[in-house]
């Protein structure tokens, strides 16, 4: 289950209710027809943004309607009798086909290409974990093949600052890109993932390093222009 209205489509109560209605329809259908295995794509937005180190045992404590929506839909999925459920909670995902243009690799590469500059929130001090969409897909396939259930955070375990990420994006253009810092409006927050459970489940999995992933997406992007 991947369908959802993301924050760029709305952050209000009306959007929340539309997303819950989607899940209600899915649950109603599965209650009638049954299902051998349900994989629900949630979000790391279910965790409190103040929590700096996250594991699957970190209590869910969403701080906005988007996070609350995903956590509610997780509960709805788990309420289905006799349906094995896996909840995946991905960190920030990047890739060529991104439609959200969220702050990070996706926005930075587009800004660099269009404007020749990348603007950061503050000095880009915050650290976040970013995962290439191909890794998300590959891990999902493994979960399906293993009939995995429970909850799994989908992250690399390596966090970098947004300034570092901007430098990686700028490097793809031969460092001709200006990186602009701005006055900080909000406190600096950090987030790191302990991916011990993921490594135990798939010990042979190798993530695409952020530097390699951004370079790959850049090549794909330039190939389209």
Pin down the residues of each PLM region.
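SDR active-site strand-loop-helix element
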Residues: 2-3, 38-44, 88-90
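Active-site helix of classical SDR
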Residues: 65, 69-72
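NAD(P)H-binding glycine-rich loop region in Rossmannoid oxidoreductase-like domains
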Residues: 1-18
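Conserved Rossmann-fold NAD(P)-dependent oxidoreductase catalytic core, especially the SDR/UDP-sugar
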Residues: 24-65
């Amino acid at each position: 289950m991947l369908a959802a209205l993301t924050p760029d489509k709305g952050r209000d109560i009306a959007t929340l209710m539309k997303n819950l209605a989607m899940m209600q329809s899915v649950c109603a259908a599965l209650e009638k027809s049954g299902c051998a295995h349900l994989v629900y794509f949630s979000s790391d937005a279910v965790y409190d943004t103040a929590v700096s180190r996250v594991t699957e045992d970190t209590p869910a404590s969403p701080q906005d309607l988007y996070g609350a929506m995903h956590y509610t839909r997780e509960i709805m999925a788990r309420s289905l009798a006799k349906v094995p459920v896996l909840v995946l909670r991905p960190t920030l995902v990047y890739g060529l086909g991104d439609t959200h243009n969220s702050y990070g690799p996706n926005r930075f590469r587009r800004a660099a290409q269009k404007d020749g500059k990348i603007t950061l929130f503050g000095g880009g001090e915050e650290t976040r974990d970013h995962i290439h969409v191909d890794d998300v897909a590959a891990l999902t396939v493994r979960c399906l093949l293993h009939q995995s259930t429970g909850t799994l955070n989908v992250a690399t375990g390596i966090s970098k600052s947004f300034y570092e990420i901007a430098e990686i994006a700028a490097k793809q253009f031969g460092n001709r890109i200006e990186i602009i810092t701005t006055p900080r409006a909000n406190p600096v927050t950090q987030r790191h993932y302990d991916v011990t459970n993921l490594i135990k489940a798939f010990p042979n999995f190798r993530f695409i390093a952020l530097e390699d992933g951004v370079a790959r997406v850049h090549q794909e992007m330039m190939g389209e222009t």
